[in-house]
């Protein structure tokens, strides 16, 4: 588990957590609250994105929409639908503390790259809510849920190399299929599976050690 994400996943699988259904319901309420806030911040871009979630769209229109999406890497856009997102991006400087009082890392870094715009809002809401969880075991399980769903929904190959771009009708359809996935709802479904397996009801931790080290160390 030399990679930190692998360390988190190993911790979650081996040690589980004690996360009651009531605690989980409160967690999802926090997630929804954060998601609603983020939706308000980029409502125009989200409305525009949703118009592409239908059958038989002109792939060139979606290609242009994606290419004109601003990020910290390409902060300028002349698309009026991106005005709100461009404003957010202007407040984020890589390597510096965020100047905004709400979570928007994925929204300002990876919108219409590795994930759709709505998906980035969902991921930021989830990650921010997870960070507020005090118990480390529970946090590890929730992070594992999020990473699992992100891996399935990402607009990329399975090893998260370069993100996929709209180049044809087929690549457009492939991307839109992935970007229609609601990350929050998929996380809820996966949590149900984890709970069924007993991963969320370990009242006494067996505590297997994970070291975040290379095997040679």
Task: Write out the residue ranges for each language-model feature.
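Class I S-adenosyl-L-methionine-dependent methyltransferase module
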Residues: 5-196
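Conserved SAM-binding loop of SAM-dependent methyltransferases across substrates and taxa
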Residues: 2
């Amino acid at each position: 588990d030399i990679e930190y994400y692998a360390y988190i996943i190993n911790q979650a699988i081996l040690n589980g957590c004690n996360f009651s259904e009531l605690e989980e319901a409160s967690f999802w309420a926090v997630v929804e609250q954060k998601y609603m806030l983020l939706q308000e911040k980029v409502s125009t871009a989200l409305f525009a994105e949703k118009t592409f979630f239908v059958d038989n769209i002109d792939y060139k229109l979606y290609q242009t929409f994606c290419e004109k999406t601003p990020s910290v890497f390409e902060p300028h856009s002349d698309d009026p639908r991106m005005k709100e997102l461009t404003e957010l991006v202007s407040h984020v400087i890589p390597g510096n503390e965020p100047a905004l009082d709400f979570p928007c890392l994925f929204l300002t870094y990876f919108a219409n790259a590795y994930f759709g715009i709505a998906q980035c809002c969902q991921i930021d809401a989830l990650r921010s809510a997870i960070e507020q969880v005090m118990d480390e075991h529970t946090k590890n399980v929730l992070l594992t849920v999020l990473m699992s769903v992100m891996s399935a929904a990402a607009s990329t190959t399975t090893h998260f190399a370069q993100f996929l771009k709209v180049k044809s009708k087929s690549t457009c359809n492939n991307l839109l299929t992935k970007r229609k996935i609601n990350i929050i709802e998929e996380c809820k479904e996966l949590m149900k599976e984890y709970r069924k397996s007993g991963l969320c009801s370990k009242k006494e931790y067996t505590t297997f050690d994970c070291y975040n080290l290379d095997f040679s160390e």
